[in-house]
């Protein structure tokens, strides 16, 4: 089962490895007071880069986001956890599923987690000169 084939009810727990954990703050909000989607994409990109870098043993870059779903808004004060799972390794590229889960620390049930965003990132391994190289060279 892949990220894009699942439904929220099918997989009620995070898939993959916890890669980033941070607090959503007021400076990251849009004009309506919710955390900006762009901020979430930035965190997901950083997590995908960390996961790809672990696999490739060095520098990587994002070449595509194949699919992304924003499932629910994120509120200020939420604890944001970004999970990554390596799905496929090609010659020079890697496909990484990224999920964002939140815990709303200020709500009545602060232990409840909710998936708010999911995406598949395509990353490539780079050499020291910024040229594409084999993932496992």
Residue ranges and their predicted role:
Residues 2-64, 123-137:
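Hot-dog-fold acyl-thioester-processing enzymes
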Residues 3-10, 14-20, 75-79, 87-137:
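HotDog/MaoC-like acyl-thioester-processing domains
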Residues 42, 78-82:
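N-terminal, well-ordered alpha-helical segments
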Residues 63-73, 81-86:
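Conserved interaction-surface patches within small, structured recognition/assembly domains
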